[in-house]
């Protein structure tokens, strides 16, 4: 892929979003190491949820997920990844993607 004429300095190929919990210090660094030139990574941090077993706790997690997605939209990201193992383990396989897609 060649750069368009007069490209922006960063993110001329793509801008990617990643949502991480506040305690995660690895995801952003690894994404930035993995992307090729012209791709930038933009992170949003979610509230840390300790109650992920009750309906109320899960609903709170999903509300905060929606807020994180909305916070990345103004950056013009092409895609958003959810970098939270616990959150993705407690929600049915397609539910998080559907919730995130519904927010974009």
Where are the predicted features?
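N-terminal glycine-rich anion-binding loop in soluble enzyme alpha/beta folds
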Residues: 2-67
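Glycine/small-residue-rich loop that forms an oxyanion/phosphate-binding "nest" at active or ligand-binding sites
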Residues: 68-104
């Amino acid at each position: 892929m060649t750069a368009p004429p007069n490209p922006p300095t960063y993110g001329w190929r793509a801008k990617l979003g990643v949502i991480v919990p506040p305690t995660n210090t690895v995801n952003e660094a690894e994404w930035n190491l993995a992307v090729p030139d012209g791709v930038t990574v933009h992170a949003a941090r979610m509230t840390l949820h300790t109650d992920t077993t009750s309906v109320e706790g899960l609903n709170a997690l999903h509300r905060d997920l929606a807020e994180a997605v909305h916070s990345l939209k103004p950056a013009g990201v092409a895609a958003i990844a959810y970098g939270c193992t616990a959150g993705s383990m407690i929600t049915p396989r397609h539910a998080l993607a559907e919730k995130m897609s519904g927010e974009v």
